A protein has these predicted regions:
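Bacterial signal peptide processing site
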Residues: 17-19
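Bilobed "Venus flytrap"/periplasmic-binding protein-like clamshell domains
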Residues: 42-45, 55-69, 121-173, 190-194, ...
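Short helix-initiation/N-cap motifs at beta->coil->alpha
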Residues: 76-88, 132-134, 150-152, 166-180, ...
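Extracytoplasmic small-molecule ligand-binding "clamshell" domains
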Residues: 22-100
Length: 261
């Protein structure tokens, strides 16, 4: 397991930050000596979730490679997604890097510096079996209750298509909303839906449709403040794709890697 022994979870979003003196390692600025501090938003499997007291997932394993390159240990801070995409968590010195299955968007790039894309993503609809849903048009025509995660590109996408949705604070709440009947259909990132459907507890649900939104995920650092860290992250992404580490992480958390991926 790539992340074994490398990742520690800080249960409070205020566990590190402005109070500690920053250090520089290989030109990269770090808020805490001996650690690469990562802001994320839990739970968001398969990219990050807590299992057995540890945070694990796709993003965790990739950032562990960055921490290893720096000779430090990754430390994870759970913080609201809103504070990640607006850059406020990074600006407050709570973390060095944001890794949260976050889509690269121009409006977000005004506040944070993105790495190169590390994951090609899209959206999906998950619904109870038998509803006959194959598109957003079906959701609208059948007047079904649609659920989405707050402040996400999935929510933005369905709203842009003229649909209203019940907004849930995180992906776990969104899934529970579907299970409890608060929503008939939910929109979420495709790999997240794939992960949910592997759980026998979700056997009565199905992948109703994929929505090709052309999204790509990126990691992020404080705007205009840490170019060496972004450079190092990009280097690790490139190297991991060449040496097979990225493929191993992909197959571990997502499944078979697409050709050319």
């Amino acid at each position: 397991v790539i992340s074994a022994g490398l990742t520690a979870l800080a249960l409070s979003a205020t566990a590190c930050g402005g109070g500690s003196k920053g250090v520089t390692v290989q030109g990269a600025k770090l808020v805490q000596k001996g650690a690469l501090t990562t802001c994320t938003h839990l739970p968001y499997p398969p990219f990050q979730s807590e299992q057995g007291g540890k945070v694990v997932g796709f993003d965790v394993d990739v950032i562990d490679l960055v921490a290893k390159k720096l000779g430090v240990t990754q430390k994870i801070i759970d913080t609201p997604f809103e504070t990640i995409k607006t850059g406020s968590a990074l600006n407050a010195g709570k973390c060095d890097v944001a890794a949260a299955g976050m889509t690269i968007k121009p409006d977000r790039a005004k506040f944070i510096d993105f790495s190169q894309p590390y994951f090609n993503a899209t959206q999906a609809l998950m619904a109870k079996k038998g509803l006959g849903v194959t598109s957003l048009d079906d959701v609208k025509a059948k007047k079904l209750k649609l659920g989405s995660q707050a402040s996400t590109t999935g929510e933005d996408y369905v709203h842009g298509k003229g649909l209203d949705s019940t907004s849930f604070k995180d992906s776990g709440s969104e899934l529970n909303g579907l299970r409890s009947g608060q929503a008939d259909v939910i929109v979420a990132d495709y790999p997240v839906v794939q992960g949910w459907l592997k759980d026998p507890a979700n056997a009565k649900f199905e992948l109703a449709a994929s929505l090709n939104t052309g999204e790509q995920y990126g990691f992020a650092v404080r705007k205009g403040n840490n170019p060496k860290l972004i450079q190092l992250i990009n280097q690790v992404i490139d190297e991991s794709k060449k040496d097979g580490a990225y493929k191993a992480i992909y197959e571990k958390w997502i499944g078979p890697m697409p050709a050319g991926g």
